[in-house]
Amino acid sequence: MLRPRAVAAVLLAALLSPFATACGSSPSGPAAGGRPAVTLAASDHLGGAPVYVAEEGGLWPAEGIEATVTTQPTGRDALNAVLGGQAQLGVVGDLPAVTAALGGRELRVVADLSRFSDWRLLTRTDRQITGFGALKGRRVGVPQGTNVEYALSRMLASAQLTASDVTVVNLAPNQVTSALARGDIDAGVTFPSFYDAARTALGGSYAELPFSGYTARTLLVAGPSASEESTTAVLRTLLRAQRELGADPAGAREAVLAQSKGVLQAAYVDAFQPRYTYGATLSPELLAQLEEEAAWAKAAQNLPGAADRAALRKYLDAGPLTAVDPAAVTVR
């Protein structure tokens, strides 16, 4: 089990390593067509669905930009691409953004793109875990440093437990299913895109506990090389994609599926995309949640940095969203 100080060291090493600053900055000049080039590191296909709708529909040029979108395995990886200069903008989860803020990194949260709260604790019938309290003393697999880890902390807290009451096993998102199948862990929490794989792998031994006590937020963040102008243009494009998603949900699901390039299955996209709430905002609820997560990260992982609301508010940049949709900015 990785102890809190070890976890803190791993997280900060990823965010503060020389590699993150020695790889050069992403292109910021005009692309071949004369439009400004913008690089965007995405992650969650469903949480960041407006990005993929925009990409599939070729919406970027209408706002005068040439966007290059890459997809990273997790929001943590997308964040590191932004911090390391490989991308100007990133689509990340709330916890990686909080971790970067506590580490004092140069980062701006420019929009909360979507919300999701339909979590599952995955387990096996032979482990007889019928409530979160039964996790005490068990081995639980989770991709640490992602918002999935925070989801686990909320599950434990719902039964008055903490990470010290279980053995946390750090696994990649796609390793949780195989670890469960082998019996290496008693339970696991991973991204929803792996739920069906776990059900298939475990067959009649599959069991799950639903949990809605944590709303994961997919954020659009800007790094130091992202200009206000290009960030505003990206947001304007994403708001158009957001409208298209609302007007034609089935078409949006097809766009996301096509952009996943075989990573996602149609049944998963059809089942789970409707469970996300879309709409770019900057709200008091977002700031309150970032404050709660920062307090947890400091206590659980011994991370540095100020966790109070005033300190975290400085990382919210309302300028671009205010320029394209003033009513969506309610945080003060």
Regions found by a protein language model. Give the residues of each.
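Secondary-structure end/capping motifs
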Residues: S227-P304
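Bacterial signal peptide processing site
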Residues: G24-P27
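Bacterial N-terminal signal peptides that target proteins for export
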Residues: M1-L11
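Short, glycine-/small- and polar/acidic-enriched structural segments
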Residues: G29-T162, T167-N170, D186, P192, ...
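Periplasmic-binding protein-like
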Residues: L113-T123, G204-P224, L235-L239, P274, ...
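Pocket-lining segment of extracytoplasmic ligand-binding domains
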Residues: L95, V168-V169, N174-K261
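C-terminal motif of bacterial Sec signal peptides marking the signal peptidase cleavage site
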Residues: P18-A22
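Conserved C-terminal helix/tail region of periplasmic/extracytoplasmic solute-binding proteins
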Residues: K298-R332
